[in-house]
Amino acid sequence: MSARISFLKNPDPCNHLSDYKLRYGTDGYKSFNNLFRCFNDARIKIKLQGIDIPRCSYCSVYQKRLYICLICRSISCSSHILLHTQLNKGHDIAIDVERSELYCCACIDQVYDSEFDEVVVSKQLFGLGMSVKSGADVVAVRSNKKRRLDSQLIIGSNFLVSPRDRREKWTFPLGLRGLNNLGSTCFMNAVLQALVHAPPLRNFWLSGQHNRDLCPRRTMGLLCLPCDLDVIFSAMFSGDRTPYSPAHLLYSWWQHSTNLATYEQQDSHEFFISLLDRIHENEGKSKCLYQDNEECQCITHKAFSGLLRSDVTCTTCGSTSTTYDPFIDISLTLDSMNGFSPADCRKNRYSGGPSVNAIMPTLSGCLDFFTRSEKLGPDQKLNCQSCGEKRESSKQMSIRRLPLLLCLHVKRFEHSLTRKTSRKIDSYLQYPFRLNMSPYLSSSIIGKRFGNRIFAFDGEGEYDSSSSSSPSAEFEIFAVVTHKGMLESGHYVTYLRLKGLWYRCDDAWINEVEEEVVRGCECYMLFYAQETVIQKAHKELSYQVISMADAFPFADC
């Protein structure tokens, strides 16, 4: 989709928010200043005087998501928020009590306003005992050649993490920076944090291989997602510690994915796939990965592209037909019937119930299930060239070539078309921080099929099942995207592993966590990098805080 845009313009607010600001300006925001409370984790929540547990004024429920009207301060749950605005004309804008985010009752959607964020972040800094700048300095927009950042809140402040980590924040690895939630955009922030710290992508953008100042699309005023990502990478590695608002990238992605252009909660995995597709298209490459025996050279496929092998074997004559398909991620089935939910784990821990480790799903089990031999049903008979007719057959997947970066997607969301129902699988999944993918390679799978005999494999030499693992099959984890909560109203958080330590990236909030916290989360997307890539990144990327005058460091991959 070709479009000319202003690159320094945030997405427009909805009409209801615009009408509210015409009538009340920002006075309504400021009137809530005495209700905002800064808690120990640096989050801002609304605390009503004399009310310990807020409840919906219509049904008295307190366990659902609650919203407080900006005009009358009436509290409504998610089931009655629309009713409130229907009964009270003009009462369209409310605040999420738990997350202190703006919500439009008429649009049934979260909305973003930088002036509201200014009030909230000012309260955060005040609660953390830090100085707050005023006037134009508070939301000044920088136009530095290296960083064209917008919506910067409280520039020059020291806010990044909770009070527990404040004294140590400057020892955090370079690139750790919070991302503001622009209205149910945690799905985007979670993926961006993982991609920003992926060594090949970090190397690509910080070394100027896609320079927004030289991009022909950008100079013509056209949309270019790689240019927007260039801005993101420059901002994240600038040394600035204030939370950053990726509004330009969100707007640009909306233009490319018009069906997803909404402030409603989206799926992180869908965003990941969509973003990589848009990067591929914007770099002007062919959509076909393999054409005339040449692989696509865009950064998306250089980093994430692997090759799957599919063997379909006739159960009558034993002949095998082989096909190859490229992939940029692998989706794994999570067997919820044999797994523990978070509540089960807590219950069994104290009641002496069955061992959690005994029946908890594991990543190796999911990969075994993915590469198992599967008998196709009678309605899936395929034409066997040897038999000359349709025969029943079996199918087995394996990995012919591994990518530099391996993304494993855990299928937690189930949608039934026949029953018209959807549900989320909350089972825990055990996964290693170091992963050996050798057992799932085509060489290993075929070796087992033929009794681990030595044989010629694809004309590329002899395969010996006893040979040691290839270094390229050893992977180390560097990011985990998690999903917590219900299907429609959950929340995405990313855990990053940098220099052997783990950091929790929850929108604008970043803090260091213990390894056990990461192992106990509900993983949704697992990002691994080849061990050699991680080792080279550790050697060549400096984690010292740099000023804007310094050159950006980068790591070869």
UniProtKB/Swiss-Prot annotation:
E.C. number(s) listed in UniProt: 3.4.19.12
Active site: C186 (nucleophile), H491 (proton acceptor)
Enzyme type, top EC level: hydrolase
InterPro entries listed in its UniProt record: Papain-like_cys_pep_sf, Peptidase_C19_UCH, Ub_carboxyl-term_hydrolase, USP_CS, USP_dom, Znf_RING/FYVE/PHD, Znf_UBP
MF terms (GO), sorted A to Z: cysteine-type deubiquitinase activity; zinc ion binding
One of the GO biological process terms: protein deubiquitination
Reaction equations catalysed: Thiol-dependent hydrolysis of ester, thioester, amide, peptide and isopeptide bonds formed by the C-terminal Gly of ubiquitin (a 76-residue protein attached to proteins as an intracellular targeting signal)
Gene3D superfamilies for the chain: Cysteine proteinases, Zinc/RING finger domain, C3HC4 (zinc finger)
Statement: the UniProt record of this protein carries the keyword Manganese: no
Compartment(s) where it occurs, according to its Swiss-Prot or TrEMBL record: Nucleus, Nucleoplasm
Domain USP: 177-531
Start and end residues, zinc fingers (UBP-type): 36-130
A single Gene Ontology CC term: nucleoplasm
Residue positions binding Zn(2+) 1: C56, C59, C77, H80
Subunit structure of this chain's protein: Component of a deubiquitination module (DUB module) formed by ENY2, SGF11, and UBP22 in Arabidopsis. Interacts directly with SGF11, but not with ENY2.
Family: Belongs to the peptidase C19 family.
Function text: Component of a deubiquitination module (DUB module) that specifically deubiquinates monoubiquinated histone H2B (H2Bub). Does not seem to be a component of the TREX-2 complex. Seems to act independently of the SAGA multiprotein complex. The DUB module is responsible for the major H2Bub deubiquitinase activity in Arabidopsis.
Protein name: Ubiquitin C-terminal hydrolase 22
Native species: Arabidopsis thaliana (Mouse-ear cress)
